[in-house]
């Protein structure tokens, strides 16, 4: 008889009726005097192992009875299909081979507070909810690369250490760069514009840092951002790229992460409906009027906060765009429409169900003198932006782009209440550990 085949839990459906071996950790266990039910995980999925007195020797049964939570071991047994099981399959265990015994595990099978779970995040990642969320995160990341590759974009890596604030903000993390002052990047967008002038369509994807003293459920101080920039493209075509992009990412998760979505209690059919295009649009002007008509105390020229975005999101049953924001509340590089000087050709995409903004974008201004004046009027250091202005001196073209916050998108698709659930080790106003 040959050696027992070692497999992974995600592949058990291929081995029904066969005896296999799996390297696992013990999530938890229950049982009576003659049977033990082992809840197992291996990093690819979850399943149950059943240890019965009549099927194993006395030593193996005692070993199963005394296993501690998160002990690691090889488990051998026959795979059975079982519709009553949460996972559809279980193993009739015949042998257990201990690899690493566990001490008393701190995250016991009971209710724990959020602060405790994130203090123990290095262990909490092993549990079912973060497992499902990280699998969805992984699928979205792979889908992002696939979308841009298929759409003819080049991956451009923007620097993380910069000498300026791309959007003129003061919410920066300073770092010492030898004898100079530098900052952790907030966005790679300006560098992506340079890339678009060289390669046509580019995107970057990496960590960004914002020193916002905000502790809302939508803010992280370190998060992952996608910046896409497209030469020879006006805003209307950019919006079409954006909605195709989001619909594709949702579709990939719906197609490939149904088990994980079920673990999180997410309605798959509701998500699938969000892939229907085109997405609705409402102007900033009309959004303000709608809010005012519904007793919101908001004036034209003010940016929307969470209550306003939540209200607007409930008016639509899909992601939607708010277009043409006031110039005063947007970045200096955004283009103005020919008919108005008080707004810019910009758009934010908001997710439905009150999840808020997931994309921000605009058509970029190509007027050298106007951009130079904008930089000066916003009290930015002109010398730090000389390279950016060069892009308008040497063959400028119409171009547009957008930025997507990865964790905000994951929060929406996974249905998470708080954004800290969407990244392995969150960094927030009050959390820098572990």
Swiss-Prot record:
Entry-linked PROSITE patterns: AA_TRNA_LIGASE_II (PS50862)
UniProt keyword list: Aminoacyl-tRNA synthetase, ATP-binding, Cytoplasm, Ligase, Nucleotide-binding, Protein biosynthesis
Compartments (UniProt record): Cytoplasm
Listed InterPro entries: Aa-tRNA-synt_II, aa-tRNA-synth_II, aa-tRNA-synth_II/BPL/LPL, Asn-tRNA-ligase, Asp/Asn-tRNA-synth_IIb, NA-bd_OB-fold, NA-bd_OB_tRNA
Transmembrane segments: none
Family: Belongs to the class-II aminoacyl-tRNA synthetase family.
Subunit structure: Homodimer.
Protein name as it appears in the record: Asparagine--tRNA ligase
